[in-house]
Amino acid sequence: MKKDEKIGLTGRTIYTRSLAASIPASVEQETPGLRRSSRGTPSTKVITPASATRKSERLAPSPASVSKKSGGIVKNSTPSSLRRSNRGKTEVSLQSSKGSDNSIRKGDTSPDIEQRKDSVEESTDKIKPIMSARSYRALFRGKLKESEALVDASPNEEELVVVGCSRRIPAGNDDVQGKTDCPPPADAGSKRLPVDETSLDKGTDFPLKSVTETEKIVLDASPIVETGDDSVIGSPSENLETQKLQDGKTDCSPPANAESKTLPVGETSLEKEYPQKFQDDNTDCLPPANAESKRLPVGETSLEKDTDFPLKSTTETGKMVLYASPIVETRDDSVICSPSTNLETQKLLVSKTGLETDIVLPLKRKRDTAEIELDACATVANGDDHVMSSDGVIPSPSGCKNDNRPEMCNTCKKRQKVNGDCQNRSVCSCIVQPVEESDNVTQDMKETGPVTSREYEENGQIQHGKSSDPKFYSSVYPEYWVPVQLSDVQLEQYCQTLFSKSLSLSSLSKIDLGALEETLNSVRKTCDHPYVMDASLKQLLTKNLELHEILDVEIKASGKLHLLDKMLTHIKKNGLKAVVFYQATQTPEGLLLGNILEDFVGQRFGPKSYEHGIYSSKKNSAINNFNKESQCCVLLLETRACSQTIKLLRADAFILFGSSLNPSHDVKHVEKIKIESCSERTKIFRLYSVCTVEEKALILARQNKRQNKAVENLNRSLTHALLMWGASYLFDKLDHFHSSETPDSGVSFEQSIMDGVIHEFSSILSSKGGEENEVKLCLLLEAKHAQGTYSSDSTLFGEDHIKLSDEESPNIFWSKLLGGKNPMWKYPSDTPQRNRKRVQYFEGSEASPKTGDGGNAKKRKKASDDVTDPRVTDPPVDDDERKASGKDHMGALESPKVITLQSSCKSSGTDGTLDGNDAFGLYSMGSHISGIPEDMLASQDWGKIPDESQRRLHTVLKPKMAKLCQVLHLSDACTSMVGNFLEYVIENHRIYEEPATTFQAFQIALSWIAALLVKQILSHKESLVRANSELAFKCSRVEVDYIYSILSCMKSLFLEHTQGLQFDCFGTNSKQSVVSTKLVNESLSGATVRDEKINTKSMRNSSEDEECMTEKRCSHYSTATRDIEKTISGIKKKYKKQVQKLVQEHEEKKMELLNMYADKKQKLETSKSVEAAVIRITCSRTSTQVGDLKLLDHNYERKFDEIKSEKNECLKSLEQMHDVAKKKLAEDEACWINRIKSWAAKLKVCVPIQSGNNKHFSGSSNISQNAPDVQICNNANVEATYADTNCMASKVNQVPEAENTLGTMSGGSTQQVHEMVDVRNDETMDVSALSREQLTKSQSNEHASITVPEILIPADCQEEFAALNVHLSEDQNCDRITSAASDEDVSSRVPEVSQSLENLSASPEFSLNREEALVTTENRRTSHVGFDTDNILDQQNREDCSLDQEIPDELAMPVQHLASVVETRGAAESDQYGQDICPMPSSLAGKQPDPAANTESENLEEAIEPQSAGSETVETTDFAASHQGDQVTCPLLSSPTGNQPAPEANIEGQNINTSAEPHVAGPDAVESGDYAVIDQETMGAQDACSLPSGSVGTQSDLGANIEGQNVTTVAQLPTDGSDAVVTGGSPVSDQCAQDASPMPLSSPGNHPDTAVNIEGLDNTSVAEPHISGSDACEMEISEPGPQVERSTFANLFHEGGVEHSAGVTALVPSLLNNGTEQIAVQPVPQIPFPVFNDPFLHELEKLRRESENSKKTFEEKKSILKAELERKMAEVQAEFRRKFHEVEAEHNTRTTKIEKDKNLVIMNKLLANAFLSKCTDKKVSPSGAPRGKIQQLAQRAAQVSALRNYIAPQQLQASSFPAPALVSAPLQLQQSSFPAPGPAPLQPQASSFPSSVSRPSALLLNFAVCPMPQPRQPLISNIAPTPSVTPATNPGLRSPAPHLNSYRPSSSTPVATATPTSSVPPQALTYSAVSIQQQQEQQPQQSLSSGLQSNNEVVCLSDDE
């Protein structure tokens, strides 16, 4: 043997009979091969190689064997010798400390080793030890035997053939023998491992298996060294490249055209590959022919295995290649590798993240080696016959740029020359063959699911791998980045994932235990489809949907899937093909993305429209179907399943559904796939979700950063940068989505960009190669990938919307973003997010126990020193929702809460949820107002004192507020005001202290409002800065402003509450007592109270004092309303400033834009001028210069147009943005104002006006939670109580009214006695339900007696009354009434009264007589005398004490001057603290209550009979809509002179009817009906005034058995007459008849009782919400006089805008014993009425009549207007119909005229042709007049002849011509007039000639007419002259033209055309004479104007005409 053969290394290849392909790698002859010893004889002797003179020893590649199968030549794709998983971080190298250098030297005993080292150094730059064949045999001999049992092949099929050294070749394998020297394919590559290194590469999830191969088995055995103990020893590693490779950066499988990696001698590479040959996600592979190979150093044994699965042996029917690098075999059957000399290798191996496990696998000589599988497509061969390769190393690919060698085609095996440049590589023209499927499948891959190995690892894992040389890599296909918007479901799931991880995101700890990476992976999976993260959403989204709707909903649930649907639809429609690449992402709770896509494509496009190559056995079939079937347009493929074996005939689009964090990895995987035809049309479309981590990853890729370095170490800062991108934007959009009322899973938070994306996508696909740049892209971005980085001139979609500050740290960013949010998830997840540790609950969190008083709450770890109410939930979320939303075990940061302030109005119906419309747009304020719920007023139970938590919160807030006041430098007064205001808020509202920012905002806002109240100047901006800096507050200005606006609305209420503390109905601070205990006891016992003299002066003073307090009270409510309006005005001003600022910014941007484009245009103009000057100078030729200048102008015009178009687009876009911003501001303003109005509306209704110390009245169980307080004023002689309702003070003159306020205490257990006083008000007040006003001007000489109702004081309150020691003055007469409370809103209103009674005080008719004032109480007539007050109250509680209804009470009292009577609702409001009591001033002689009546219902009837000088009966009844009417005790005014018996009445009415029935002198009786009150919103407070009456009347006690719902009060005024009174009342119950006691008479003596039957009380106002009156009801009274019914004053106050609605109910005792008074009047049988004149009655009657007349007038005018409208409409319709007919007739006339003109033109053509034939005489030579000239003349004449009307045919028919018919019948046309002044001449077509010639005989000739084809040609005949047709006799014919007279005889005969009567053959045209033609050409016609004068003349025209 030769010397070089002895030194060389020998590689051996083993083939089976079924082998179909050779080693797909070119062999590089770097070292000679080693010959192995004889079979079975181990030897350490170096085997010399074959002859060194082999032609292919160094230059030619090693032989690549091929074999035939099924008649086709199949190439064996070379698996990478160094394969690693896509997730591997490090290459685990098996480093054995065992072994010695002696073992290595044992294999290197050849004396010529030193010469070989030089060759080794040439390629590896280091000395590689040479191993003998014995080393290889020792390694594989026993190992390959064990795999023999796994091979399912017969001995014939497995017969081995030795190739390379020509030892054994099977006889039947001719292909192998004949092609041993064939080079490997051009694109095949291999990797080289150094000597003594064993590389085991395996995927993550699947076991490494050894499979049987029945067809194709290739075994490459590199030399190894066998030691005596059967161990394999490798040489130490000395190349630092080893560490780089072992770091897990380069173990990648090169693509089909990628560079190969050389494995140096001495290393065994064991690698497993899934059929798709997945490649590491982060590996930058190189293209062929451009890259340098990279080699592993000598002495490294690399065993790479993944973490998840054990190393197994499996069977596989594909191909398997085993690469055996030289190792050293020892005697103990172990593989020994020398330790690496570089210790950094071990450090790198150990310091990896643990994603790849270091595995030490002993390679036993007999079994272990054969059990290791390197490629899933190949199997280990059996047998001991190992054929050594001719080379000691695995050949490098031909793609290496230093190799210019012939290659072999992959398909046809033709040898071809390949240069180093892959772009210039020749492509074989052979047709790609289908991929053959394996015939014998022994064991398929797992069919239970797709691949989940490390190559199939979820997309979230970041791969750390380095490419060999990424700087030389560039993409083959153009790539476009396609933006996709998240759907609503994805948006919520994305934000929910971030929200659930808020604790770890905002943490400062650097040890997160993988929480950040887990969050990153979760949000990336969400971007693909929400089902990937949570499969339970499928049930939620598809609930209650039809079957055909489910697919659409699931598609729209993912923005990517929705866009993919559109893209694939377009692709299928246009007959294109696409490959969809996806990442195999899956979670335990979700679905696999591949299955989702497969179901989608199958259902949407049909089962035959796609292929999905998941499994090994089905992948080849799927690819073949995709290539063959025309209907199959989609191929689904996992990104890492791409391999060089996949060959597609055509693919127009590669769609990347999911992306890696390093986008270049996806491109490298995709480019492994080979496109055989039209590959230049293939484009890559990468879908990315905007404003998410996917977009941020692309931004990083575009920033020219090395991606392998950017994502190599996914550190904390990079993870935060990815997660922070777009988070704020998405949370803002989440607020929009949650604010919408109709959730939709589609893209709804912004206008979808899908249409624009699809348009650009279709444009790119339709463009040809090289035209991509011509497509103008706005949404899609073309990314240029070169040298491992991306570059682009455009920005991504989200970069225009997101401005992320780099200065803000991540923890601050997440704290601000997530700290104040508490979203209500619309798509809650059933699987909460996993948490690394259990979070400690903060006190007050949702998980804390809900205790009533908060005292039993377990102590927990606190986040701060704040105290939280344990019952706080905002908004209330049940456990299921909390678990579903992932907030079950979150702390304060995980589940933030919102501070809430809720009013006490529980009846408002709010449920604590945020109204979506109100929350919309608030994020634009710059903070999180949207996080603060709209319902900022929590309901407070007014029946209970504040609970323990609120009191404890108050205790905690006091020192906090004190500290804040100190920091803000507030004065002592302001600090005191802060404490008072805080106390008020705590008592009336519920405050929560979560989240902390809102709680801090509340504190600052409280200090602001306190400073405002004490008028201390406090800068809001400065105070906020101080609080944030000194107290570490983190609240924003917007939050403080919002809460401050709410507190501002409470300012006036707080002031009223503060002032009300000094007014106490039982308070000792009142210097003057009002009620005597003795009098109270007497009142309760039924004793008679003596008449007391009333001092007029004291009454006037008390009236003034009462008026003053009323004004104050109304002022408070008016102030509250003004505060609300002021707050709203401030909001409007604030937004107005923002709008102005926005407009200003818009104008600035617009001007900047215009200036920019103006500059551009100026630059272009300058450039154009310069270029034009250059052209003028350089171009000497004029033509060239002009052409160049024109071209220059054209080019610049196009540029100018482009600039203009671009400017217009930018301006339009700017305007749109401006409009959107303005719209958003308007929506924000409306939202804020609406929320303030809603808050204020509920607050005004339910605001408590409390008296200071009346809390002892809150003991009833029936008390309403919304019952307001009653404020009581005590002055010198008066106790005033005001009903707590809303009224507005108007500035018109006030009408005095009688205010009868009826009320009871809450639950009836306690009642309060109030005194009726005189009140005078000069202002017109809107008085609500239970308020009445009366103005009294009493004179000392007048007498007035007032009957007052009973005073009901419960027994348990008598001690309190006794303790007061109050005394009743003789000058006082007081009525005690009880006010009712209700939880209903006060909706009844009293209309404003415009009449003035300011002169009432001057009237002498209403003077009070103190001596005659006597009130006596009659208890004899009552049926239940024995009941005391307690029994009455108890019975009331049992039967009718309901606070849910309202009782109106009205009383129209007689007043002196004419005025309107204002009736008010008889319902007052009261809460547990007190009641409103309306004083009634009166001149009482005495009073005595009688509680003996039996109360069975809530109705009460009172009769008032004042006596006046006049006599007029007025009956007024009150109504109200009541649900469960409460009882009202109404004080009535009278001037009694005697005692009257108290009648008994059984009243069943449903409303309170207060009827004043004065007797009228005349027979007229006036009935006042029910009428409503004004709207609630116009009333801010109630003015409680009493109207004194100077009338003398009586009031009887009513022992009523009341079954109705309301109180009926009847006031009877005795008059001189005795007219029947018909009262309008309320509807009654089924019992229509009522027993009534006789009404008292106003007479000096006692009168017998009279029975009053009240029947048929009907009130329509109960059911109608807006009504001004009620129907009249009859009140039958037994009296001798006639009965007169008067209609009610139904419309009395309707004109003033009366509106009726639910009012406040009043609960009063039903039994009142009113003292009867004796009045000196004449008795009347049965019911005598005294004579009484009352000016009020006259005024009321007048107003009633005016109202009726007004209504009648209105109806009449309305009917007149309606009739007028109908009449005018009929006239207008008739007029337009007439105009329509005129236009139509005009149109028809014009159409007829046009038709006539058209027919005339046709006729003139015929005549012209006839003249042409006639004028051509035979005398004229044919050559004398050219035919063309004649035709020109004819055309000119045609223009002139069109102006003439032809009438000659009718005239010529009457002549005696031989041919009488001038024209044929079919040619006779209608005539129409032309606008021309003269008739139109004849219109010849060919030419015009004279009408006559010199020879009349010529007229006898017949000529054919040529120019116009006609059914028959016109003939010209000579007509004998007759007198009728001569010019003298017939004016229709004219003489010939003057210039033709020389050619005419003396008697010229006119010509006429006639239709031929006989068939005359047409003849050719001839010309008469040359002179005629010349004359026509030279002379103009002189007689044209004269020839146009006649309609029937034949005109002869000259040539010019």
From Swiss-Prot:
Question: What are its E.C. numbers?
Answer: 3.6.4.-
User: GO terms for molecular function, please?
Assistant: 2 iron, 2 sulfur cluster binding; ATP binding; helicase activity; hydrolase activity; identical protein binding; metal ion binding; protein homodimerization activity; SUMO binding
Query: Region entry Disordered: which residue ranges?
Result: 19-126, 169-207, 243-311, 441-468, 841-893, 1466-1517, 1528-1547, 1624-1644, 1915-2001
Q: Which GO terms describe its cellular component?
A: nucleus
Q: What happens when the gene is disrupted?
A: Reactivated transcription of heavily methylated silent loci, independently of chromatin demethylation. Releases TSI, 5S ribosomal RNA genes as well as 180-bp and 106B repeats of chromocenters silencing independently of chromatin properties. Partial derepression of 35S promoter homology-dependent TGS in transgenic plants. Abnormal aberrant mRNA transcriptional read-through. Increased expression of minor 5S rRNA species. No nuclear organization alteration. Lost ability to form a high molecular mass complex with PIAL1 and PIAL2. Released transcriptional silencing of target genes (e.g.
Q: Where is the composition biased (Basic and acidic residues)?
A: 103-126, 189-204, 269-280, 292-309, 863-872, 880-891
Segments of this protein annotated with the region Conserved MOM1 Motif 1 (CMM1): 953-1044
Residue ranges of the 2Fe-2S ferredoxin-type domain? 357-448
Q: What Pfam families has UniProt attached to this entry?
A: MOM1 (PF25029)
Q: What is the effect of changing L1740A?
A: In CMM2-mut2; slightly reduced multimerization and transcriptional gene silencing (TGS) activity
Biased amino acid composition, Polar residues: 39-53, 92-102, 1528-1540, 1915-1929
Recite the other comments: Requires for the complete maintenance of the 35S promoter homology-dependent TGS induced by T-DNA construct insertion.
Q: Which PANTHER family match?
A: ATP-DEPENDENT HELICASE FAMILY PROTEIN-RELATED, HELICASE PROTEIN MOM1
Q: What is this protein called?
A: Helicase protein MOM1
